[in-house]
């Protein structure tokens, strides 16, 4: 199995992992509008507000990202008895996958970060917050709830935004309890004194935070490694994962191993919350049994996804799979998409009046028979989507020695063909769910089927589509090719 295949499989294993996240919950508000003039009162732009949204921020965004990759997080935090606190509690409750343990502290100001945007450009951020440590009674409640949740957790995350939930006594105590229970601890740190996180498994400072915590220059790879090693030596961390914006990430481990991961983003729109995505993906991966380098690789890929979105965004599991495939692609890379993204593209095609076709198969060792069917399929429509069985699906259908080529390789070959407009990898034995989602106008299969035996034929016909049986090329099959290769 290739490293890529292993990572793709790892993404699936993120589902159902239990991660305990403790930290500062916030409310992220986004105000979108347009700017067409300068204020006569001062040399500042006038934002004409068009819409507003709100979502979980701070440690809450870590939890959102955990849910996005399929994890089942428990969330322990504190809010005030104010409107923002009630909104945070409501937003947490909207995610059925989250086990919420939100403690209300009377009189506390719930942190609100309000960002103003015009044409994807952030103009201003306005904060309302409290940085005071939570009271002793609240701290006792937090510890009681965490003690109950810790045994079930694969990993504990401390998401410290310096708003009081993880003030020194509680951070130290939580790490002590987690280590005693044999749990890994990931810390997204705040401030300059990292000794309060001593004994944590991994800390994830950005470049600026690393400089402030160590006082060292962090411009080059060598300087970043030296500063990270200082933290490892002084605080007993197993590893430091440094996020370095356009320079990617650097993982430095106590055993001396170093991994430099290049930035994955193609275009950066907004870095809001990217650090939360890194922490969440890293935690879910470690909870699933991944090694630190594997987990860091996935976290780096996830960060590249979210900075390409506007606002405090998340990276979904299917987006991770697509991004992993793209690492090895040269031609047709934009053609390989998850079914959710394919549905959006198909909708755009339909609005332009284009007829959408669909065919599917394993396409292991592409041969003239495959090429002929794809050409006939494209001839029956304007845009052709190819459903591709995943490696696991092919193995169930064809046996333990198949596929010969990985799903990444098969998708790459298909996407390089001019007849193919999109490739969607599916893990089920049949493409029925994909067909139901995309609702193609034309469904194409080889003439070795009859229409009543074609999976999805009744569905396509139910919405007025048609089923086309493509002519076969005699003697062409992957099985025959494999037999010839084996001398049979």
UniProtKB/Swiss-Prot annotation:
Pfam families: CTP_transf_like, PfkB. GO terms for cellular component: cytosol. GO terms for molecular function: ATP binding; heptose 7-phosphate kinase activity; heptose-1-phosphate adenylyltransferase activity; phosphotransferase activity, alcohol group as acceptor. Keywords: ATP-binding, Carbohydrate metabolism, Kinase, Multifunctional enzyme, Nucleotide-binding, Nucleotidyltransferase, Transferase. Residues 358-488 are annotated as: Cytidylyltransferase. It is an enzyme of class 2 (transferase). Its EC number is 2.7.1.167, 2.7.7.70. Gene3D superfamilies: 3.40.1190.20, HUPs. HAMAP family: HldE. PANTHER family: BIFUNCTIONAL PROTEIN HLDE. Catalyzes the ADP transfer from ATP to D-glycero-beta-D-manno-heptose 1-phosphate, yielding ADP-D-glycero-beta-D-manno-heptose. Homodimer. This is Bifunctional protein HldE. It comes from Paramagnetospirillum magneticum (strain ATCC 700264 / AMB-1).
């Amino acid at each position: 199995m290739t490293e890529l295949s292993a990572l793709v499989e790892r993404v699936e294993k993120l589902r159902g992992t239990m991660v305990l996240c403790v930290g500062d919950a916030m409310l992220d508000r986004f105000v979108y509008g347009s700017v067409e003039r300068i204020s006569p009162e001062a040399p500042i732009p006038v934002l004409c507000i068009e819409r507003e949204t709100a979502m979980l921020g701070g440690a809450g965004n870590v939890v959102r990202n955990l849910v996005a990759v399929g994890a089942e997080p428990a969330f322990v935090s504190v809010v005030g008895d104010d409107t923002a606190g009630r909104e945070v509690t409501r937003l947490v409750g909207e995610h059925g996958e989250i086990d919420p343990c939100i403690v209300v502290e009377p009189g506390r100001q719930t942190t609100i970060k309000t960002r103003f945007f015009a044409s994807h450009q952030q103009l201003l951020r306005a904060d309302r917050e409290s940085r005071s440590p939570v009271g002793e009674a609240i701290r006792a409640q937090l510890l009681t709830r965490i003690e109950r949740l810790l045994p079930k957790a694969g990993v504990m995350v401390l998401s410290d935004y310096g708003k009081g939930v993880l003030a020194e006594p509680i951070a130290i105590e939580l790490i002590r309890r987690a280590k005693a229970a044999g749990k890994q601890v990931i810390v997204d740190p705040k401030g300059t004194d990292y000794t309060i996180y001593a004994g944590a498994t991994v800390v994830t400072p950005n470049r600026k935070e690393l400089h402030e915590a160590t006082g060292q220059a962090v411009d080059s790879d060598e300087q970043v490694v030296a500063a990270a090693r200082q933290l490892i030596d002084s605080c007993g961390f197993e590893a430091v994962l440094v996020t370095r914006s356009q320079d990617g990430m650097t993982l430095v481990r106590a055993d001396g191993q170093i991994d430099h991961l290049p930035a994955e983003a193609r275009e950066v729109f907004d870095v809001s919350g990217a650090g939360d995505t890194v922490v969440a993906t890293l935690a879910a991966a470690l909870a699933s049994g991944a090694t630190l380098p594997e987990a860091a690789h996935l976290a780096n890929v996830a960060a590249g996804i979210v900075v390409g979105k506007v606002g405090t965004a998340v990276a979904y599991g299917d987006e991770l799979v697509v991004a992993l495939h793209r690492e090895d692609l040269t031609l047709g890379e934009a053609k390989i998409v998850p079914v959710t993204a394919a549905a959006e593209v198909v909708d755009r095609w339909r609005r332009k009046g284009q007829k959408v076709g669909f065919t599917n198969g394993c396409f292991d060792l592409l041969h003239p028979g495959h090429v002929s069917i794809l050409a006939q399929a494209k001839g029956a429509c304007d845009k052709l989507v190819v459903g591709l069985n995943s490696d696991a699906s092919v193995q169930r259908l064809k046996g333990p020695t198949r596929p010969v080529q990985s799903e990444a390789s098969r998708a790459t070959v298909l996407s390089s063909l001019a007849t193919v407009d999109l490739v969607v990898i599916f893990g089920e034995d049949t493409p029925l769910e994909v067909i139901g989602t995309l609702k193609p106008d034309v469904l194409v299969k080889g003439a070795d089927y009859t229409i009543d035996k074609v999976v999805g034929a009744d569905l396509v016909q139910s919405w007025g589509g048609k089923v086309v049986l493509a002519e076969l090329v005699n003697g062409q099959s992957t099985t025959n090719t494999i037999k010839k290769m084996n001398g049979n």
